[in-house]
Amino acid sequence: MRLLPRLLLLFLLAFPAAVLLRGGPGGSLAVAQDLTEDEETVEDPIIEDEDDEAEVEEDEPTDLAEEKEEEEDVSSEPEASPSADTTILFVKGEDFPANNIVKFLVGFTNKGTEDFIVESLDASFRYPQDYQFYIQNFTALPLNTIVPPQRQATFEYSFIPAEPMGGRPFGLVINLNYKDLNGNVFQDAVFNQTVTVIEREDGLDGETIFMYMFLAGLGLLVVVGLHQLLESRKRKRPIQKVEMGTSSQNDVDMSWIPQETLNQISAGRERHTEVTLQLHRPVVSDASYACFSCFRKLPRPATLAAWTSSLRQLAVCGI
C-alpha cells in the first residue's frame, strides 16, 4: 500500500517527461517546415521578377524587328526615275477652300532613251505629324499614257476637300505612278507638303439663310409689338352720343300715324292760329273803319297833287 502512492507520483512525473521528449523532435520539424515555406514565398517574387525581365528582354527584339520592317517597307516603296522629271501647277493658286474644287496640272518629262508608261495619278490628305496616317484619300486617276523619249505630257487632276476639314492643316501628298518597258515601277511624289484648308466664305448656306430669316421675323415682331403699345397709350375713350331729337318737323315720319289723329292735330293747329291772330289783332274804332271805307272810295291819284289832297282827307278823318 505504501508503494502505490510512490508509483502514482512516479507515473505523474514520468508521463509529462515522456510527452516532452516525444514532442521535441516533431516540434522542431514543424518549425523547420515553416521556415522553408517562408523562404519559398520570398524566393517566388524574385523568380517572378526575373520572368518579367526576361519577357521585356524578349519584347525589345520584337519592337526592333517591327521598326526594321517598317523601315524596309518605306525603303521598298518605289522611287522616282532619274530619267524623268515632274512639275506641278495649281490652277487657282495654292489655296485649298473647303467643299470647293481644287485643280492642278502635272507635267511629266521623259529625259531618257526609253518609253515611260504613266499609269495613274493620286492625291491624299494625311496627318501632319505622321504621313503614314491617311485623313482623306482621293480617287486615283487612271492615265495609261505612253511618253516617248525627249517628250512631255501634261495631266489634269482635281479634288474637293471635305467641308469639316476647313481651318486645319493637313499633309497633301500627290503621287505620279509610272513604269518603263522593262516593268520597273516608279513613283514620284510631285507634291508633299503641309497645307491649310481654308473655310469657304463666299455664298450662303441653308443655316445662314434660316438665321437671317429668323432675325428678320424677330425684328418685325418687336416693331409690331412696340407699335401696338404706342397705339394703346394714345387711344382715347369713345365719346358718348346724346340723342338730340329731330331738328325740324320734316324729319318726322307721319305715315305710321292714323289719318283721324292727323286731322285732329291739324284742326287744333288751325284753332290755335285763329286765337293767336285775334289776340294780336289791333283794336280799330268805328271811325277808323269809316275812314278806311272813305279811302277805298277815293279815286286813285294820278299826280302828286292828287296824293296830297287824299292825305288831307284822311287827316280830317282822324287817322
UniProtKB/Swiss-Prot annotation:
Major place of residence: endoplasmic reticulum
Signal peptide: 1-21
Disulphide connectivity of cysteines: none
The keyword Calcium belongs to this UniProt entry's keyword annotation: yes
The protein's name: Translocon-associated protein subunit alpha
Acidic residues composition-biased segments: 35-76
PANTHER family from the UniProt entry: TRANSLOCON-ASSOCIATED PROTEIN SUBUNIT ALPHA, TRANSLOCON-ASSOCIATED PROTEIN, ALPHA SUBUNIT
